[in-house]
Amino acid sequence: MAPTEVLAEQHYNSLNPILEKYNIKTYLLTSSVKDRSEIINQMSSSKPVFFIGTHALIQKDVNFTNLGLAIIDEQQRFGVDQRKKLIESSNIIPHQIVMTATPIPRTTALAVYGDLDISVIDELPPGRKEIESILLSGSQRDNNIVIDYCNEHLKNNSQIFVVCPYIDESENKDIKAAEKVYEQYLKLFPDKKVRLLHGRMKSEEKESIMSKMNKAEIDILISTVVIEVGIDIQNATLMIIESAERFGLNQLHQLRGRVGRGSKKSQCIFHISNKLNIDKVTDVGKQRLNAIVSTNDGFKLSELDLKIRGEGKVTGTNQSGLSDLKIADLRYDFDILKLSKIFINKELTPELEEKIYGEATLLFPNFMKFMKGEDAS
């Protein structure tokens, strides 16, 4: 399951030729496919079948007879209940793999708590170079520097992404909007192919634009966060994130990852809104911007995000905010919890588990009341 049709189609096109060699049927299920009922009928097949899709996989009429493996890509884009729906859509509990470039705070907390085991790919693919991150203010001087970077990359026959938080101008005109920025870039680069992409466009129009970007028929693409996942343009070497203080840390990291996918040197500019500098940004916004330019490491960023946002309800569905833990604080107890998990995984037996629970009940008679948030007086 992937969060966007573009990404689901990309996975289908990659996996279908491989699985065909083993006589495994592969089906793509999204909201726009025409043979939906036929695909759903295949879910009761007794033969090995591979389904790739979007949220269409978790609709009410979708039921798997024998789901053995559930893979969720870009899992930070799905809510807790949505991930649960996929896993519970079969009469057996499937094996699960969740994939993300930046685990959200709740994921970090759950991984520490033992619900998830983590495998880390901490190396760049062969031939790729580290992306350089640059933080620029909204001053006129820095605005001109952004254009200088554009000229430099265009001279190298590279492509550029410019991402804005909104489609239209808001009441605060200093926050960059995609349509306004598109008009500006048309004037600044009249001899270049500048295009606009956003979520209000029809699917066919979006697909056409991305196809042209893929074929290097577009030089500069002005967009909203619709390109956050599933875009693989190897010739794109400059990402400009306008009004960067308006984005979450997770989004900033995902957007940065849209460049640096080829062998050319790539850069990502985090450009603050007009007339703003880092000192005028909110404390939380400042922490996010300083964090994103300090590292390209997704796991380090997730730990920083954990400190900024909190881990959310360990037993509920909130993925950020105050914890429901009464003693531990995963923002500060991360290392000791990590060591505890390693120890318990090695040493825990049913007898030891019973003994620990018994001791805890004696030492903390009001333990269950604490956990339920009841009055323990």
Model-derived regions, located:
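Conserved nucleic-acid-binding Ia/Ib motif block in the N-terminal RecA-like helicase ATPase lobe
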Residues: 2-51, 55-56, 186, 191-197
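Structural recognition of the conserved hydrophobic beta-strand(s) that form the central parallel beta-sheet
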Residues: 1, 29, 50-54, 71-72, ...
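Conserved interdomain linker/interface between the two RecA-like ATPase lobes of SF2 helicase motors
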Residues: 115-182
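Loop/turn-to-beta-strand initiation segments
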Residues: 25, 46-50, 66-69, 92-97, ...
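SF2 helicase catalytic motif II
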Residues: 56-98
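C-terminal helicase module of SF1/SF2 nucleic-acid helicases/translocases
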Residues: 141-159, 179-377
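Conserved motor-coupling elements within RecA-like helicase/translocase cores
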Residues: 30-51, 58-67, 203-220
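Flexible beta-alpha connector loops of hexameric P-loop NTPases
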Residues: 5-6, 26-35, 71, 76-77, ...
